[in-house]
């Protein structure tokens, strides 16, 4: 039986789930990059679904040590011919959401988390543009963003965003490379 939690705890739980799905996105991008850049390793990897070949695992570990943004940038570059501008926009949005979650101010005393973008006004404007944020006249100065994933519509919107990449984009790219999606996802 699932117990109903107070909103602050529910927000932390749902935010944690979203964060883990962004980690899954990063891992899948990693496998797609490795497979595209290393066709011989890909063949060995696909041929042994229950055991990851040592050389392939070494490549994975190299990517596990990288930040999401570095993996995302390489992924977008390597698959530039196969990604639509909308898919790149969605992956960028996932990157921003991951950073927001990772750097949020968390409290179990309120039903939202706060995130303060860093990097100056230019980067703030890019974040606002990439996420489609509409600032009100009463917006905090400096800008603070609320994370309210306890709200079902907010959680569902992010879930749909991630699903559009994992279930459409990644499946298509894996098929193009001849990799069973279940092996990398």
Functional labels for PLM-detected ranges:
Residues 1-70, 85-96, 100-113, 147-185:
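Amphipathic alpha-helical interface elements
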Residues 137-146:
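C-terminal structured domain segments
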Residues 73-74:
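Canonical alpha-helical transmembrane segments
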Residues 77-86:
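Short acidic (Asp/Glu) patches
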Residues 115-138:
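Short secondary-structure subsegments characteristic of cysteine-rich extracellular domains
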């Amino acid at each position: 039986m699932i117990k109903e939690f107070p909103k602050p705890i529910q927000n932390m739980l749902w935010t944690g789930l979203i964060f883990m799905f962004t980690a899954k996105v990063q891992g899948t991008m990693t496998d797609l990059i490795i497979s595209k850049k290393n066709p011989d390793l890909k063949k060995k990897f696909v041929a042994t679904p229950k055991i990851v070949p040592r050389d392939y695992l070494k490549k994975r570990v190299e990517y596990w040590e990288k930040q999401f943004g570095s993996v995302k940038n390489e992924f977008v570059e390597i698959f530039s011919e196969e990604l639509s501008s909308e898919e790149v926009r969605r992956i960028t949005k996932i990157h921003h959401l991951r950073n927001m979650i990772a750097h949020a101010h968390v409290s179990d005393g309120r039903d939202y988390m706060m995130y303060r973008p860093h990097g100056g006004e230019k980067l703030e404007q890019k974040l606002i543009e990439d996420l489609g944020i509409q600032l009100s006249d009463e917006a905090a100065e400096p800008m603070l963003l609320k994370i309210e994933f306890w709200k079902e519509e907010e959680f569902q919107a992010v879930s749909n965003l991630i699903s559009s990449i994992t279930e459409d984009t990644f499946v298509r790219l894996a098929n193009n490379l001849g990799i069973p999606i279940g092996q990398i996802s």
